[in-house]
């Protein structure tokens, strides 16, 4: 009888009320009885096993919210600082500097460049051509006459000639330089022509000269022919040179 009454007493609504009264506000808590304490521990274990995922999720959510919120606030607060604003405006300035570096010829096309004392146009190596000086016939005659007298002019002479002809000293200097270069080319061409004519005259003289008389031929095969040729060659000079035998015969007679 007692065994059956204990489960009923456990399942009775009174014991359930005693258990739920433990979760009331702290000022209204009552001193628990031994029976209610046992029910409270069992209920806590049962409820903790079922409510553990919810507790973990709630704790994670509670931790995630404060962590995310100060991070956003820190970013928003730092965005108003001058350092962040300067960093945010840096890509625009970098792209502008890059566009200037990619197009370096924009400024060079508008200006002339002087390199090595030579005036260049657009920086592409094209020289600005000066206008060509046109000399009159009277000026050319006077310059040619002076060039026949001397090929090099001193500074006073050049200044005097330029003033008399209405030219600048630079124009007179350039004309004399060009005239000297042309004169040297003509001299070189004339020297080559003289050498060619001398060679032609030498060949003509060698062709008109008499033939050389044939001498002794060492390559002749017959001894008779060689003796005859030597005999014909030697007697022609015996009249000029006396033989050694005749000189030996004359010496005993004198003694």
Swiss-Prot record:
Residues 100-112 have a biased composition (Basic and acidic residues). Residues 1-38, 95-118, 204-233 are annotated as: Disordered. Plays a role as a transcriptional activator or repressor. Inhibits several cytokine signaling pathways, such as TGFB1, activin-A/INHBA and BMP4 by interfering with the transcriptional stimulatory activity of transcription factors, such as MSX2, FAST2, SMAD2 and SMAD3 during hematopoietic cell differentiation. Plays a role in terminal differentiation of interneurons, such as amacrine and bipolar cells in the developing retina. Likely to play a regulatory role in the development of the ventral forebrain. GO terms for cellular component: cytosol; nucleoplasm; nucleus. It comes from the Eukaryota. Belongs to the distal-less homeobox family. The keyword Transcription regulation applies. Its main location: nucleus. This is Homeobox protein DLX-1. Residues 1-14 have a biased composition (Polar residues). The lineage of its organism: Eukaryota, Metazoa, Chordata, Craniata, Vertebrata. Interacts with SMAD4 (via homeobox DNA-binding domain). Interacts (via homeobox DNA-binding domain) with POU4F2; this interaction suppresses DLX1-mediated transcriptional activity in postnatal retina and enhances retinal ganglion cell (RGC) differentiation. The gene is Dlx1.
């Amino acid at each position: 009888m007692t065994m059956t009454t204990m489960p009923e007493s456990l399942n009775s609504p009174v014991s359930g009320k005693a258990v739920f009264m433990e979760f009331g506000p702290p000022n209204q808590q009552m001193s628990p009885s031994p029976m209610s304490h046992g029910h409270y521990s069992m209920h806590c274990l049962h409820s903790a096993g079922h409510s553990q995922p919810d507790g973990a999720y709630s704790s994670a959510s509670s931790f995630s919210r404060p962590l995310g919120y100060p991070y956003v606030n820190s970013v928003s607060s730092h965005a108003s600082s001058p350092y962040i604003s300067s960093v945010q405006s840096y890509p625009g300035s970098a792209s502008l500097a890059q566009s200037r570096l990619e197009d370096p010829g924009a400024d060079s096309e508008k200006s002339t460049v002087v390199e090595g004392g030579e005036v260049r146009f657009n920086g592409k190596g094209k020289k600005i051509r000066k206008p060509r000086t046109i000399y009159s016939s009277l000026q050319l005659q006077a310059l040619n006459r002076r060039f026949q007298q001397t090929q090099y002019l001193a500074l006073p002479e050049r200044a005097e000639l330029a003033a008399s002809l209405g030219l600048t000293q630079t124009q007179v200097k350039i004309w004399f330089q060009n005239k000297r270069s042309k004169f040297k080319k003509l001299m070189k061409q004339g020297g080559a022509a003289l050498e060619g004519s001398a060679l032609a005259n030498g060949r003509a003289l060698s062709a008109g000269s008499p033939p050389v008389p044939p001498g002794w031929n060492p390559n002749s095969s017959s001894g008779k022919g060689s003796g005859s040729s030597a005999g014909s060659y030697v007697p022609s000079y015996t009249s000029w040179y006396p033989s050694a035998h005749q000189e030996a015969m004359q010496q005993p007679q004198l003694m």
